[in-house]
């Protein structure tokens, strides 16, 4: 992309005066005399985004201008998230051209002002190449660049911040303030609390110190308040404590205790879902927690030895603990509630380029940026699929040369941004300008591996990922050394020259040891080797412009803006996804990477069509016609019957960590059946493999996660019998495919019923629920207040409406799901031991009806349990009765009644098969849930109500692009 005209190195304090000729910029994608915008076809589109749950319009802007090849989803996200100016005013951006120009022209001007370019012509080529890469979704800056650059507001370009706190009240209060200002700007922050005295140490006044866990409470409340004060996403926040801190056990247990509190409150009837009205009363819910462990501790765990907890004031050991027992407590806590994560201190600092300026103590909330305290990092991610050359016949290669040139372009732009960037605090601004940390990374790794026929958990897949990562970071540091020759090394380089060069040698040595696997990765390794040789040579001569170059971020919103199939280093979520259509609507499609992989593996077009059709029908490759079993692993995804194992994720992290300056944002997902020992294995093996940090998430471990939709059976044999009987009944009943109209099934004159008296918040009432003699609930009568009153009349009308609906076949569970959790007065305590708290009379009524008439699995999925079941859960960990307690006959009788239908004359047709009525999914995450019968671990989007999906250690909304992280 660029060539360097050499000149003597000089300090970056010289305010941009050039010592050499600057960068000579080479055209790679663009044509002389033709602007990149003129090479593509543009069209006008309407962006109307709704909350599909209630139909309300969240965002609307019509007539926006985008290239024809941009997907509907990418257009929606960029328009709603990144266009600036009030909608409906002349100041509002209406075209992608305006957005890209706002950014690239700012970067060009700053580059010219700071003497980066050899000539105005080179500056123009830089602008055009940068515009082309953004226009064609080859890479993306992190969200703050899109939000702020070129606008009147502060030019904040960094998404990741690390703060610090000392053992003084002034410093602690400054922490609260600085963190709040960063949250206000939509970014995230992390810090290490280990300098704060433990609760086991004395104050100068003679009393005991509060300890860091106590001060975490105030910071957590602050983060929650700022979120509720108008932000569309949760504040991203990380707190870390060293494993040798005397309060480490309290820190480990903070979220476990709160999770137990959440469960108790939920069982009492409070709304404890993520984002629920009552969850705000629970502490420590706004941060990720991580324990920083060192090699001494991990070796003590390995050997079964003791480990010393040290005073913050004197450094002396004040308590010895069993290392293995403490490690077990960490694993138990993570198993129970997904926190704490783990960071490996000695591994992190062994790769530290600036140890003379301080240790690496903290990280950003997603754990990919790790450097000095009070610093920041601006991120950018490359779309790896844009560099795959595929002739459509199975012949593939990775364009390493073009990839390297784009990396050079992006690193240059990222470094220029530090020249004009604003920062939330003076300390962060000074340190970031002095050390100039960058975080280039990539997205779509999972898609690239599948497209090239590599299993995610395979030696070939890891080799390809490692080669690309090594080339990216090697090229980045080479460009950094070239920039140092023109505009000088970073201010802290002189003090840290020796350790910085040592780390470069470590990267280079790891590159030399890497195993080459096939025709795809071998040329990339060769290019990476050349890059690292240049790094060592130029770095020795010029120094480096940047103290850090690369991280792997979650790439949440920006990944969707680039139309990436996968985020960060994640594997594909599933083989079938949703594609939004221009003009509205959507369709299910099999990933385009699937046929690419099949061609690479040598399958013929007829075979590929059959396999793709099987995937479209079943959502997986199992028993796909003509697909060899040894190729199944290529199509393994994050979820499903053939999901990638936890250690498969860890091995991929270990394969690319040696060539990343920072770390990797990654959560290792475990199935609900995983044990504490499995968590211990992941944490221990990751340390042995050289990973810097990770977190785990065991499915269904948190109350805030939607309940699993997969029902549990009584016994496997009974399941088989029930299935056979059901299929026989269906075959007997469904003989023709006809058009139906529902009819009302009235109750007989004499009908069994239950009358229940109740009080809700002091208001008394009676409910009579009458049933069909053998087939479920048929009508409901409610008696409240005196006859003739408004409330009594409304209850009568409501009862009639519900009863008529039941008699026309509306399932009771539909009413229950709609009317539970409605909030209005009267509300509060009830006299019913099974429903201790009700948010309204309607909430109580339908919880009571669910308990009386719905089968266990149905109401359990809705979070409704009797007092006996809640007690059983406390004792055994399960709401479900044991096998000898089950009344199978009773369950069958209480099953929901099939709707009676009358046929209207239509042509006769034979029934091919009886399938459940299709549910309506709105995102790929929800489609996966339908196919797999389980619900993905994810909250609902605060903006549009869509189910979010994981992106690294964060969540991303596929519908509107909102993210819980910082990219």
Curated annotation (Swiss-Prot):
<feature type="binding site">
    <location>
        <position position="143"/>
    </location>
    <ligand>
        <name>substrate</name>
    </ligand>
</feature>
<keyword id="KW-0547">Nucleotide-binding</keyword>
<keyword id="KW-0170">Cobalt</keyword>
<dbReference type="GO" id="GO:0031419">
    <property type="term" value="F:cobalamin binding"/>
</dbReference>
<dbReference type="InterPro" id="IPR013344">
    <property type="entry name" value="RNR_NrdJ/NrdZ"/>
</dbReference>
<feature type="region of interest" description="Disordered">
    <location>
        <begin position="1"/>
        <end position="23"/>
    </location>
</feature>
<comment type="similarity">
    <text>Belongs to the ribonucleoside diphosphate reductase class-2 family.</text>
</comment>
<dbReference type="GO" id="GO:0004748">
    <property type="term" value="F:ribonucleoside-diphosphate reductase activity, thioredoxin disulfide as acceptor"/>
</dbReference>
<feature type="active site" description="Cysteine radical intermediate">
    <location>
        <position position="366"/>
    </location>
</feature>
<dbReference type="Pfam" id="PF12637">
    <property type="entry name" value="TSCPD"/>
</dbReference>
<keyword id="KW-0846">Cobalamin</keyword>
<feature type="binding site">
    <location>
        <position position="188"/>
    </location>
    <ligand>
        <name>substrate</name>
    </ligand>
</feature>
<dbReference type="Pfam" id="PF02867">
    <property type="entry name" value="Ribonuc_red_lgC"/>
</dbReference>
<feature type="active site" description="Proton acceptor">
    <location>
        <position position="368"/>
    </location>
</feature>
<dbReference type="InterPro" id="IPR050862">
    <property type="entry name" value="RdRp_reductase_class-2"/>
</dbReference>
<keyword id="KW-0560">Oxidoreductase</keyword>
<dbReference type="InterPro" id="IPR024434">
    <property type="entry name" value="TSCPD_dom"/>
</dbReference>
<dbReference type="InterPro" id="IPR013678">
    <property type="entry name" value="RNR_2_N"/>
</dbReference>
<protein>
    <recommendedName>
        <fullName>Vitamin B12-dependent ribonucleotide reductase</fullName>
        <ecNumber>1.17.4.1</ecNumber>
    </recommendedName>
</protein>
<keyword id="KW-1015">Disulfide bond</keyword>
<feature type="disulfide bond" description="Redox-active">
    <location>
        <begin position="160"/>
        <end position="377"/>
    </location>
</feature>
<feature type="binding site">
    <location>
        <begin position="554"/>
        <end position="558"/>
    </location>
    <ligand>
        <name>substrate</name>
    </ligand>
</feature>
<feature type="active site" description="Proton acceptor">
    <location>
        <position position="364"/>
    </location>
</feature>
<dbReference type="GO" id="GO:0071897">
    <property type="term" value="P:DNA biosynthetic process"/>
</dbReference>
<feature type="binding site">
    <location>
        <begin position="364"/>
        <end position="368"/>
    </location>
    <ligand>
        <name>substrate</name>
    </ligand>
</feature>
<dbReference type="InterPro" id="IPR000788">
    <property type="entry name" value="RNR_lg_C"/>
</dbReference>
<dbReference type="Pfam" id="PF08471">
    <property type="entry name" value="Ribonuc_red_2_N"/>
</dbReference>
<dbReference type="GO" id="GO:0050897">
    <property type="term" value="F:cobalt ion binding"/>
</dbReference>
<comment type="function">
    <text>Catalyzes the reduction of ribonucleotides to deoxyribonucleotides. May function to provide a pool of deoxyribonucleotide precursors for DNA repair during oxygen limitation and/or for immediate growth after restoration of oxygen.</text>
</comment>
<dbReference type="GO" id="GO:0000166">
    <property type="term" value="F:nucleotide binding"/>
</dbReference>
<feature type="binding site">
    <location>
        <begin position="159"/>
        <end position="160"/>
    </location>
    <ligand>
        <name>substrate</name>
    </ligand>
</feature>
<keyword id="KW-0237">DNA synthesis</keyword>
């Amino acid at each position: 992309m660029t060539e360097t005209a050499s000149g003597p190195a000089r300090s970056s304090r010289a305010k941009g005066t050039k010592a050499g000729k600057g960068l000579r910029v080479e055209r790679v994608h663009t044509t002389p005399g033709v602007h990149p915008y003129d090479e593509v076809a543009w069209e006008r589109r309407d962006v109307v985004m709704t909350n599909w749950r209630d139909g309300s319009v969240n965002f609307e802007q019509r007539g926006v201008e985008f290239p024809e090849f941009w997907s509907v989803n990418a257009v929606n996200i960029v328009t709603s998230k990144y266009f600036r100016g009030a909608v409906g005013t002349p100041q509002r951006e209406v075209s992608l051209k305006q957005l890209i120009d706002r950014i690239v022209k700012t970067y060009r001007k700053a580059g010219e002002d700071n003497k980066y370019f050899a000539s105005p012509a080179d500056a123009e080529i830089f602008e055009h190449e940068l515009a082309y890469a953004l226009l064609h979704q080859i890479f993306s800056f992190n969200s703050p660049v899109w939000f702020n650059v070129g606008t009147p507001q502060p030019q904040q370009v960094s998404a990741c911040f690390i703060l610090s706190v000392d053992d003084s009240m002034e410093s602690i209060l400054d922490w609260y303030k600085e963190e709040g200002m960063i949250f206000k700007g939509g970014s995230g922050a992390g810090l290490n609390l280990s300098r704060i005295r433990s609760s086991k140490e004395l104050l100068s006044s003679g009393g005991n110190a509060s300890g860091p866990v106590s001060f975490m409470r105030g910071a957590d409340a602050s983060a929650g308040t700022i979120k509720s004060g108008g932000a569309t996403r949760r504040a991203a926040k990380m707190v870390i404590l060293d494993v040798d801190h005397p309060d480490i056990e309290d820190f480990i247990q903070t979220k476990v205790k709160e999770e137990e509190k959440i469960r108790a409150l939920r069982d009492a009837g409070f709304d404890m879902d993520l984002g629920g009205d009552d969850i705000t009363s629970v502490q420590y819910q706004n941060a990720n927690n991580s324990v920083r462990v060192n090699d001494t501790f991990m070796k003590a765990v390995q050997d079964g030895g003791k480990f010393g907890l040290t005073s913050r004031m004197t450094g002396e050991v004040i308590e010895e603990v069993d290392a293995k027992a403490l490690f077990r407590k960490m694993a138990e806590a993570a198993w129970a509630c997904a926190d704490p994560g783990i960071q490996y201190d000695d591994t992190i600092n062994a790769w530290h380029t600036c140890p003379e300026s301080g240790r690496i103590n903290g990280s950003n909330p997603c754990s990919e940026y790790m450097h000095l305290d009070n610093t920041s990092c601006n991120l950018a991610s490359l779309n790896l699929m844009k560099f795959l050359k595929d002739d459509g016949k199975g012949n593939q290669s990775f364009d390493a040369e073009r990839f390297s040139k784009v990396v050079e372009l992006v690193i240059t732009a990222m470094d220029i941004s530090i020249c004009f960037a604003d920062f939330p605090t003076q300390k962060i601004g000074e340190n970031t300008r002095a050390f100039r940390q960058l975080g280039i990374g990539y997205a779509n790794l999972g898609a690239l591996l599948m497209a090239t026929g590599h299993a995610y958990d395979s030696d070939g897949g890891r080799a390809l990922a490692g080669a690309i990562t090594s080339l990216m970071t090697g090229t980045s540091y080479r460009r950094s050394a070239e920039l140092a020759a023109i505009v000088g090394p970073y201010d802290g380089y002189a003090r840290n020259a020796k350790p910085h060069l040592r780390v470069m040698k470590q990267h280079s040595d790891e590159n030399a040891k890497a195993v080459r696997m096939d025709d795809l990765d071998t040329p990339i390794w060769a290019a990476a080797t050349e890059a690292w040789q240049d790094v060592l040579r130029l770095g020795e001569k010029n120094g480096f412009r940047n103290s850090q170059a690369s991280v792997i971020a979650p790439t949440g919103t920006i990944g969707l803006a680039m139309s990436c199939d996968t985020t960060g280093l994640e594997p594909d979520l599933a083989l079938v996804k949703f594609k939004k259509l221009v003009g509205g609507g959507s369709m299910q499609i099999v990933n385009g990477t699937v046929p690419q992989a099949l061609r690479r593996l040598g399958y013929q077009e007829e075979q590929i069509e059959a396999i793709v059709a099987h995937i479209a029908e079943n959502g997986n490759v199992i028993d796909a016609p003509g697909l060899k079993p040894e190729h199944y692993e290529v199509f393994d995804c994050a979820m499903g019957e053939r999901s990638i194992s936890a250690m498969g994720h860890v091995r991929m992290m270990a394969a690319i960590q040696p060539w990343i300056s920072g770390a990797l944002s990654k959560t290792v997902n475990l199935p609900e059946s995983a044990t504490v020992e499995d968590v211990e294995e992941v944490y221990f093996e990751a340390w042995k493999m050289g990973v810097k940090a990770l977190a785990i998430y065991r499915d269904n471990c948190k109350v805030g996660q939607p309940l699993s939709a997969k029902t549990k059976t009584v016994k496997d044999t009974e399941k088989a019998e029930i299935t056979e009987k059901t299929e026989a009944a269906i075959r007997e009943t469904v003989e023709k495919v006809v058009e139906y109209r529902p009819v009302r099934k009235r109750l007989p004159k004499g009908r069994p019923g239950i009358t229940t008296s109740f009080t809700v918040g002091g208001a008394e009432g009676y409910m009579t629920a009458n049933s069909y003699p053998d087939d479920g609930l048929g009508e409901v009568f409610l008696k409240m207040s005196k006859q003739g009153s408004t409330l009594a009349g409304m209850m009568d009308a409501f009862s009639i409406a519900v009863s008529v609906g039941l008699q026309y076949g509306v399932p009771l569970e539909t009413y229950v799901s709609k009317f539970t959790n409605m909030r209005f007065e009267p509300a509060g305590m009830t006299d019913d031991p099974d429903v201790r708290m009700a948010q309204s009379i309607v909430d109580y009524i339908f919880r009571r009806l669910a308990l009386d008439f719905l089968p266990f699995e149905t109401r359990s999925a809705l979070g409704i349990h009797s007092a006996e079941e809640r007690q059983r859960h406390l004792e055994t960990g399960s709401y479900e009765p044991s096998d000898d307690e089950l009344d199978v006959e009773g369950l069958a009788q209480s099953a929901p009644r099939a709707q009676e239908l009358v046929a209207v004359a239509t042509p006769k047709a034979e029934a091919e098969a009886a399938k459940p009525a299709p549910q309506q999914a709105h995102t790929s995450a929800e489609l996966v849930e339908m196919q797999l019968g389980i619900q993905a671990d994810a909250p609902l989007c605060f903006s549009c109500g869509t189910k979010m999906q994981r992106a690294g250690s964060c969540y991303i909304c596929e519908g509107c692009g909102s993210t819980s992280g910082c990219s």
